[in-house]
Amino acid sequence: MAVEDMDKKYRISDIARELQVSPQEVLRFVKEGGAKVASTSSMVDSEMRGLIFAEFSNEKKMVDETRKIRAEKQLRLTRLEEQSRRAVEKEQILRETLTPSPAPPVHEPPVRAAAQPAPVPVAAGEAPSPLAPETPAPATESAPAVAPAGVPAAEPVSEALSAPLPEPVPEPVPEPPAPEVVAVVEAVPNDQIVSYDAPKNIGGLTVLGTLDMQSEADRKKKGKKKNFREQAVALKDEFETPSSTTLDEDGVPKKKPVAGVQPEGFGVGKKKGKKKKPAVDDKVISANIRTTISGMDDSSGTGSRSKFRKQRKMEREREQEEADLLRESEQQIMRVTEYASPHELAELMGVTAKDIIQKCFALGKFVTINQRLDKESIELIALEFGFEAEFISEVEATAVEAVVDRDEDLETRPPVVTIMGHVDHGKTSLLDYIRNSNVVAGESGGITQHVAAYEVTASNGRKITFLDTPGHEAFTAMRARGAQVTDIVILVVAADDSVMPQTIEAINHAKAAGVPIVVAINKMDKPEANPEKIKTQLSEAGVLVEEWGGESQCQEISAKKGLGIEELMEKVLTEAEMRELKGNFSKDVPATGVIVESELDKGKGVISAVLVQRGYLKVGDPFVAGNIMGKVRALMDERGKRIPSAGPSQPVSVLGFEDLPQAGDVLTVMASDKEARDLAQKRQIIRREHEFRRSTRVKLDSIARQIKEGLMKELSVIIKADTDGSIQALADGLMKIQNEEVKVQIIHQGVGQITETDVLLAAASDAIIIGFRVRPNVNAKKLAEKEDLDVRFYSVIYHVLEDVEKALEGMLSPELHEESLGSLEIRQVFRVPKVGNVGGCHVLEGKILRDAKVRLLRDGVQIYDGMLDTLRRFKDDVKEVDAGYECGVGLKNYDDIKVGDVVEAYRIVEKKRKL
């Protein structure tokens, strides 16, 4: 049997469901363990199942503990609400009971006179009381016990009005009135606290009897407050007004015998049932005492000036206490944006990113330092460190009230479609074909300007809006800012290739956003196309097409030849019909939209592509987008034509922004310019506060100072090199550099030129970038300057290790700063006898100097570093060539130049270090 158990297979998704964790996390763990599995539907053996349970059991315990804590908290809240409700009800009963108490002095003489001749009618009058069902039981039980000592209480009641001594009276025994006396004396103990009830008022006695109807648990709870009750009675006796003590003839001595009679055993239940009122009176009594004492102190002062000084001092102390309490509570509240990274959380909570990542591992979440966390994970991590997470954003200050959409304003709107997939699988070709097929007559030259969003019309006349986003990174960035704009995702996969890692990432992002996927299998015109293989791999990745019993629609296409494009559009429209996409087309509703892309035009200023989601955006509308305000100066469609307004799901280019907004920011139309400006300023304050909490950028120059100040624990490094061997050598050398206070941590390494992704990663994790024989592209260089990042370039491994080691020791020599002069592109190569190869070049930017140093870049990788041999223009040697001009260039001792190569000119400038 043991062998059979070992051979038994378990599905990964079933194990994840049993452990209550994400199947993707379990799949990732299994892959890291070396097992060959393709998807969450794959099977594992018993041994691997045991390893999975050992790894993720902590997370299941955490989930169970969290649920248990929530249940206990809810139970405590329920009990507190029930106790407060009971207290209010009993206090109300006491107030109703005490309301008629001033009347007894009027009826008291007749009651005393008639008590002896007609006791039976009084008992009969009490018997039909609505409280009789439960009251007789304790009365009859107490009667035999009281018979020897309680029967003579008929005379103590009458004598209590004249003398406070009940003990000498018990000897005379009037037998006939005994039953009546038991009823009368039984009610008297309830009046121990309130002197009004001492008279034998029948109505008052009957109502007070209701306090007997209490559960045993309540009696026990109130019994614990006995000491406080006795203190309250004593205090009230001292501060009681004369009117309340002289309601009866010789009222004061009358209260004392009642207190002496009660402990003899027949009023115990009612004594406990009455204990709620002293708890209420306690607060009133203590307040009266404080008022009296403070009044005495004030009256004994030297004058109004000292009295005012004391009051001001007390107020200041009270305000200081409140401020201290508020400050302590605010220190434990962490204001953070959703989808924050472990690095940002560490900065806000004053811990290291390593601690955050370790907590995530303990919770079963495998994260990196720059990976964005969801809301639930941030809350759990904050609780682990004793903080309460309060999620904010720069748009949380939005004072715009959401107007409820009326049914009559809702109409069917065009779907918004995003095309995602691997870069080489034909995504761009599909976009180009769809765009070019919708060029109107008269625009035979095609669409010259590129826009991020455009609207096309299908063959049946229905419209579809396409978003041209650069991969799933932009898709995620927009979702991270709360902008859910995409309705449908078209996933492009090449039929002659396979499902690539980027394809799987796109699938995961679409699923996380809850967006349906329409699969487009491209390149079906190629002979090696194998769509069945693609469908199999997609099913392993969690996307099952309709032909195989799934929910995702699939269409085989050829973007190059236009095969299947119309069918793909029809399936997209079918998916949109199933989702019943509606939009508010009312012209009275303030318009809202989402920023898809922004750019800065030299002549027009800031131009942003906006996708309207609600209402109509019109020329002249004041608006707020993120923390940027503006006023619509012009609206243009994707072909540059001016339009007066734009409705839901319609892409439009907007002019009128004061600054560049970010992609994903929500544009909201405001009632006036003043409201828009005030709202933008509030959001700017919040954003500045959040950015202020983050640390400054790490520089290699200032590492030693930060180490001394205790601000630096790890030096994060990103390595980009020309070959994998260089990366391994650099990584091994850097990891060996150790210091007592700091160590080097490589957070990313890769082959190829430095890209924008590397710069963004360095900005998010406060890292420096080391480029070994590679250079950044133009956009990455500009972004690094904007983010103020430290990017360094080397060609010798020893120099890298030496600089980093010296930086850690605070012994950096003066810096040799590289100043970029310009760049040119080789357009043509000429062979010159006795000289070698000469490039016919076009200067792209800057200025090329004859005596400048140059480097030759091919596909972003450095090939040559040296000097210029010749610089000519029209057969003449020149000293410099400006941007936009053509020239001939020869490199010193180097002939291997090709068309498309880029030559960068630079010079070395010495710059003093600042420590």
From Swiss-Prot:
Sites where the protein binds GTP: 421-428, 468-472, 522-525
Annotated stretches, region: G1: 421-428
Gene Ontology CC: cytoplasm
Segments of this protein annotated with the region G4: 522-525
CDD domains: IF2_eIF5B (cd01887), IF2_mtIF2_II (cd03702), mtIF2_IVc (cd03692)
Region (G5): 558-560
Name of the protein: Translation initiation factor IF-2
The protein's role, per its UniProt record: One of the essential components for the initiation of protein synthesis. Protects formylmethionyl-tRNA from spontaneous hydrolysis and promotes its binding to the 30S ribosomal subunits. Also involved in the hydrolysis of GTP during the formation of the 70S ribosomal complex.
Listed Pro residues bias regions: 165-177
Stretches for region Disordered: 83-177, 216-280, 293-328
One Pfam family cited in the UniProt record for this chain: EF-G_D2
